[in-house]
Amino acid sequence: MSAADGHAPAAHPEEAAYRAWLAATRDEPLESMAGFFDARAGGYEAHMARWARHYAWMAALLPPDTAELLDVGCGSGLELDYILPRFPRLRVTGVDLSAQLLRRLREKHPGRALTLVQADYTRFDLGRDRFDAAVAFETMHHLTYAQKTALLARIRQSLRPGGCFLCCDYIAATQAIEELALAECARRRRRDGIADGAFVHFDIPLTAAHELQALQSAGFRDAALVGLLDGDANTALFRARR
């Protein structure tokens, strides 16, 4: 409570909006990750176009000597639409669950050195010491802190020493929102009889502080919040090195 007036401090404005969204959608069934994106593949790029400035930002931050790139959760390659023109000889390995989005990516960039893998990137072997850089765009906010840290450790292993990792992702504005999202996802899993290990489409974002902590716990060096673009307080860009 406030010492000045005896009232509890006001909640963050985004918390009220988030609670209202949870209440409005509480009866919606969970969908598998692959099923969610395959069902919406036709409108995916139009929906994601709002992050055009973020794609360009990520592309500009890739080290100029990048020759081998890992794209985790590449989808239809919206970030690659900005990255590939900058790196004409770039070799890309993209991993995604959606066959339809991967097909769209290949259609957009014929003749480019793309190795596209339809797989769950939380389980797929990313290899060791393979890539100069790795990127992940708006994909890892469906993972718990423990799942994310484990994946980040594997991404780190896949990089060559000194390799760069760029992650642009949805973040929780407050710790309360992070906790609310996690609790609601668990409730819906129980309701729908879905095992904890099944990959479902429900946002469980971390706060920026926890995102940095996960990067550090995974062994990355120089983990930093690069920033947020004006007008978008919930999409942050992080950078780290192996």
Residue ranges and their predicted role:
Residues 1-30:
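N-terminal auxiliary segments of SAM/dcSAM-dependent transferases
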Residues 70, 76-123:
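Class I SAM-dependent methyltransferase SAM/SAH-binding core
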Residues 50-65:
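Conserved alpha-helix/loop element of class I SAM-dependent methyltransferases that forms part
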Residues 126-134:
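A short acidic, Gly/Pro-enriched loop at the edge of an enzyme's catalytic core
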Residues 149-161:
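A short glycine-rich, Lys/Arg-flanked "PGG" loop and its adjoining helix->strand segment in the class I
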Residues 25-52:
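Class I SAM-dependent methyltransferase Rossmann-like catalytic core
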Residues 168-218, 224-227:
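C-terminal alpha-helical "lid/dimerization" subdomain adjacent to the S-adenosyl-L-methionine
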Residues 218-242:
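Core SAM-dependent methyltransferase catalytic element
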